[in-house]
C-alpha cells in the first residue's frame, strides 16, 4: 500500500462544502473521490486537513489517501485534473509515510478572508462586501488580541466533534491588498464557521454597529455575550496547511 498526499485548490461556490454527503449532494470530497476511484480502479477514501463549509474556497487544502495502485504520482495528478470540474484542481503529488494523516498530522492551518468595500460583479464570487465604511486600524487592533489560547465558542456554530472550543492562535491581523481588506489568521485548529464569525464581529465593530468591548466579552466566552452573524462564505479561503518537519515527503516519481 502507498499513502499519497495532494494539495487541492477549489472554488467552493457550487459545492455543499468539502465533506461527502449522501443523496447525490455535490461536494468537493465527493467529486475527488469519484474521479480517483475511476483512475485507480479501486474505492478511495480521502482525509482532508480542513472540512470547509458550503461556499468556502481553498488555495492550499491538503488531502491524503491510501492505494494499492502503482500508477506514478504525476500521472495520478494529471488524470485527476483532466476528469475534475474546472472548479477543482490538484498539484504537488507526494508519497508519504503510512502514518501521515492530512488532518491529524497538521500542526497549523491558515485562513484568509477577502473583503470588498464596494460591490463587484467580477470579484463578488470570491470576497465578502461591507455595506458601510470600516475602521481598518480598529479591526486590526481587535485581531491582534486573538493571539494565544482562547475559547472561541461565541464565534462558531455548535461543536459536534467533541474536541472542545479552545484554539491556539499564532497570529492574526488585517491588511490592505490590491483593493481588498484581508484578514489573515493562523492557528492549530478552527471551530466550525469560526473565522467567518470573527470577521463578522470585527466588521460590526469596524462599522460602528457594536462596541469594541463586546469583542472581549465574546473572546472571554461570556455567557451573556452577543453571538454575531458570520460573514459571507464567499470571502473565505483555506490558504495553507503546515506540517511538522518529520513528515518529510519522498521525491516525486
Swiss-Prot record:
Keyword annotations: Isomerase, tRNA processing
Record-linked InterPro entries: PsdUridine_synth_cat_dom_sf (IPR020103), PsdUridine_synth_TruA (IPR001406), PsdUridine_synth_TruA_a/b_dom (IPR020097), PsdUridine_synth_TruA_C (IPR020095), TruA/RsuA/RluB/E/F_N (IPR020094)
Organism annotation: Chlorobium luteolum (strain DSM 273 / BCRC 81028 / 2530)
Top-level taxonomy: Bacteria, Pseudomonadati, Chlorobiota, Chlorobiia, Chlorobiales
NCBIfam families given in the database record: hisT_truA
Record's subunit section: Homodimer.
Signal peptide: none
Identification of the protein by name: tRNA pseudouridine synthase A
Binding site for substrate: 111
Catalytic activity, EC: 5.4.99.12
Active site: 53
Coiled coil start-end: none
Keyword tRNA processing in annotation: yes
Task performed by this protein: Formation of pseudouridine at positions 38, 39 and 40 in the anticodon stem and loop of transfer RNAs.
GO BP: tRNA pseudouridine synthesis
Keyword Plastid attributed: no
Reactions the enzyme catalyzes: uridine(38/39/40) in tRNA = pseudouridine(38/39/40) in tRNA
Main enzyme class: isomerase
Family that this chain belongs to: Belongs to the tRNA pseudouridine synthase TruA family.
